[in-house]
Amino acid sequence: MHNNEQDRISPISRRSFIATAVAGLTIASVAASPLKHLQGGPIKIKAIAFDAFPIFDPRPVFGLVNQLFPEKGIELAETWRTRQFEYTWLRTAGGIFKDFGAVTEDALVFAANKTGVNLTTAYRRQLMDQYLALDVWPDVLPALETLKRSGIRLAFLSNMTGEMLKSCSRHAKVDSYFEHLISTERAKTYKPSPVAYQLGVDVLQLKKEEILFAAFAGWDASGAKWFGYPTFWVNRQGAPGEELNTSPDGTGKGMTELINFIR
């Protein structure tokens, strides 16, 4: 769950994302068409490496926070979300690794202490368990079906642990679409470290130019571009672009735009 303060999901957001008719897209055009890289000539995309959150919808986690702590839910959720990613970046910079589940729980404890809520053992477990049972966004299943038929290989490349990716994939019934569930825990670091992005190249055994990285957060899109991946930002929150001297090759609000981009 790859984000800075601009990329936080508002726990009170009720924005609906309408399922789109991507299943009707022409399969052959998706598979055969080259992609124009911003810094070079035409290239052929052979695989897509997804961050977890263009696929999985994390909003129920923050809805549960509001349900359990109605008076301080917004403050708790925002503090938790911010600290979660700050801890991954701090641990990456310091070279002291803890897996994403542990980091997420540490951030939750910090947020509870800061906001003064009574985080019981039962509440703590309930919130952490929600990260193991995320559903997909409404536009995901038809898009995955289209991509699968096209012959493009699909993988996750996420800061989430392997256990989280496997559990959510099975819960949401999308595990059959993904060839690899690549967690950055394999490298004992987090994105945007180049070592983390290199996992996609190593596991898929493709050139980085042949792997489209699909980011959820603006900072992750920037990190993937720094590494050298052609990059599409699935900007579901409508966040402004980062000021990091790079831009994704494409951007859109959902999976329809992603498929149109690679057609």
Label every model-predicted segment.
Residues 123-135, 140-170, 184:
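Substrate-recognition element of Asp-dependent hydrolases with the DxDx(T/V) motif
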Residues 88-125:
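A metal-dependent, Asp-based hydrolase signature
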Residues 62, 77, 81, 101-109, ...:
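An amphipathic alpha-helix signature
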Residues 12-31:
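N-terminal export leaders
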Residues 1-12:
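N-terminal secretory signal peptides
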Residues 29-41:
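Bacterial Sec-dependent signal peptides at the C-terminal "C-region" and cleavage site
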Residues 2-4, 20, 145, 157, ...:
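Asp-based, Mg2+/Mn2+-dependent phosphohydrolase catalytic module
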Residues 41-82:
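Active-site neighborhood of HAD-like aspartate-dependent phosphohydrolases
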